[in-house]
Design a protein with these regions (language model features):
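N-terminal amphipathic alpha-helix/helix-capping segment at the start of soluble metabolic enzymes
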Residues: 1-4, 56
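Hydrophobic faces of well-ordered beta-strands that scaffold small-molecule active sites
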Residues: 3-8, 30-32, 61-68, 107-109
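Short beta->alpha connector loops
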Residues: 9-13, 36
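Acidic (Asp/Glu)-rich catalytic clusters
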Residues: 19-25, 44-67, 93-103
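Glycine-rich, proline-tolerant flexible connector loops at the mouths of alpha/beta enzymes
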Residues: 31-57, 111-118
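Active-site acidic/histidine proton-transfer and metal-coordination neighborhood
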Residues: 57-59, 74-125
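Flexible loop/hinge segments that line or gate small-molecule binding clefts
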Residues: 71
């Protein structure tokens, strides 16, 4: 069994501290939370990706999973009008691009809460 450190709990510290702890405590990999300030997909330009890959190499701690922030505001794949859903799909595509550029083998997606919409409407999406 392998264990990964999910970096969401480090959102109020430097991302490097997550890599330091993962290495110090014997974790096998990083699950990188894709939220601000560390790795929000729209912020992930080539320079930011390079910084994170450098931390991964420095601490011998691979980024195997990228988990974009999508469990609440501003993205919910299950609610909103067509324009909001299309925006969510663009964000999802960008998140998967970021995951690939980071060298992660997985992107963890949570579809969010369907609210109280009609079941047929949810299935149609």
């Amino acid at each position: 069994m392998e264990l990964g450190l999910f970096t969401c709990g480090y959102q109020y510290t430097s991302i490097e501290s997550a890599f330091i702890d993962a290495a110090a405590f014997g974790y096998d990999f990083i699950e990188l939370w894709g939220g601000r300030p560390h790795a929000w997909a729209p912020d992930m330009d080539a320079g930011r990706v390079a910084q994170l890959r450098e931390l991964s190499a420095r601490y011998a701690m691979p980024i195997r999973v990228y988990t974009p922030e999508h469990n609440g505001y501003p993205y919910n794949y299950m609610l909103g009008d067509e324009g909001q859903w299309e925006d969510c799909m663009r964000y999802l595509a960008r998140s998967m691009e970021v995951s690939s550029r980071l060298g992660a083998s997985r992107t963890l997606i949570s579809v969010g809460h369907g609210g109280h919409t009609e079941p047929a409407q949810r299935r149609a999406r």
